[in-house]
A protein has these predicted regions:
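N-terminal phosphate/diphosphate-binding loop that engages ATP/GTP or pyrophosphate donors
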Residues: 21-95
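Conserved glycine(s) of the Walker
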Residues: 14
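Terminal disorder- and signal-encoded targeting elements
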Residues: 1-3, 26-29, 315
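The Walker A (P-loop) glycine that initiates the GxxxxGKT/S ATP-binding motif of P-loop NTPases
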Residues: 9
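Phosphate/Mg2+-binding loops and adjacent switch elements
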Residues: 91-218
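Hydrophobic positions on the alpha1 helix immediately C-terminal to the Walker A/P-loop
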Residues: 17-18
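C-terminal lobe/tail of nucleotide-utilizing enzymes
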Residues: 200-217, 221-315
Length: 315
């Protein structure tokens, strides 16, 4: 299995439960594991009945398992502050207040949330994953996740254009220098070029890691809405040149015993039959294989039940 494992899917299908169960399974197999939530709902804390922050902390009762929850709002503020500090060092004092004003306005603009969250989880992959054999990501609902995963290519192209424009600008300043006059800007040691180059390397790492060192699984429920959403998600991954390793069917209805014939038993049999039809559709029409089928429990999946679910996750 790849070092980085992502679980995605439609909201409410049980991504967090599956992510935490898989992380528990890995830890129980002596695979040092970190589970990371990028979902604003912060349900990882609820599953383990333990509060987590943006630094890895040991999960009580599970040796070899740490957890952390990335807060998108905190990450956005941190992201904007880093930009503010970086630009303040490279522009005149007269422009600093205008930069601050523009950054405050950008707080609620489309893409700001995704950019900050993207930086956060790639930083985890790049800088905080060394102590671990495996890092499991419990992601936000499919649409947000696909936008995140598409950022390396989009922002990489954008950075390339900025680098080109900056080099053009410096080249003009160098050519405009007269006689022995020192040009106002030099290519070597230019702080803007250096910052852009670091961002380019960051995006290149992210794209390479997600294509070559990450496995993506989609969690679905056995209903038509979830199946349709999963189909669109698979198409979205394919468009981004990312392969979905497998599908996990969650919240399946347990079949009643053969000798049960009451109204409830008849209802359950009909529901089970409908769900089997949906799973048959998934097997026939989708390229990624169905790698696990997890039945619903009568109680919330927490504590001991998490290990019970983990036993069904042979992925």
């Amino acid at each position: 299995m790849e070092r980085f494992v992502f679980f995605g899917g439609k909201g409410g299908v049980g991504k967090t439960t599956v992510s935490c169960a898989y992380a528990t399974r890995c830890a129980n197999a002596d695979v040092r594991t970190l589970v990371v939530s990028t979902d604003p709902a912060h349900s990882v804390s609820d599953v383990f009945d333990q509060r987590f922050g943006d630094d890895p902390e040991p999960v009580a009762g599970v040796d070899g398992l740490d957890a952390m929850e990335i807060d998108p709002e905190d990450e956005m503020q941190r992201h904007l502050q880093e930009i503010r500090e970086g630009l303040s060092e490279q522009v005149s004092a007269a422009m600093v207040s205008e930069i601050n004003r523009q950054l405050e306005m950008s707080h609620g603009t489309p893409g700001a949330y995704e950019a900050a969250l993207f930086d956060a989880f790639v930083t985890v992959m790049r800088e905080e994953s060394d102590p671990y054999d495996r890092v499991v990501f419990d992601t936000a609902p499919t649409g947000s996740t696909l936008r995140l995963l598409g950022l390396p290519e989009f922002l990489g192209d954008w950075i390339d254009r900025l680098l080109y424009k900056r080099k053009q600008s410096i080249d003009l300043f160098e050519k405009a220098a007269i006689g022995d006059m020192e040009p106002r800007r030099l290519m070597d040691g230019d702080p803007v070029l250096e910052r852009l180059q670091r961002r380019k390397e960051f995006f290149e790492y992210a794209g390479d890691a997600m294509r070559n060192d990450a496995a993506f699984f989609l969690v679905l429920n056995p209903d038509q809405l979830s199946v349709n959403e999963t189909e669109r998600a698979i198409e979205g991954f394919t468009e981004r040149d990312l392969r979905v390793r497998g599908l996990v069917a969650n919240k399946l209805t347990p079949a009643p015993d053969d000798d049960e014939n009451g109204r409830g038993a008849r209802y359950l049999r009909e529901k089970v039959e409908t769900e089997r039809d949906r799973l048959g559709q998934v097997r026939e029409e989708f390229a990624p294989p169905l790698v696990a089928e997890i039945e619903s429990r009568t109680r919330e999946v927490r504590g001991d039940l998490l290990s019970d679910v983990a036993a069904e996750l042979d992925v």
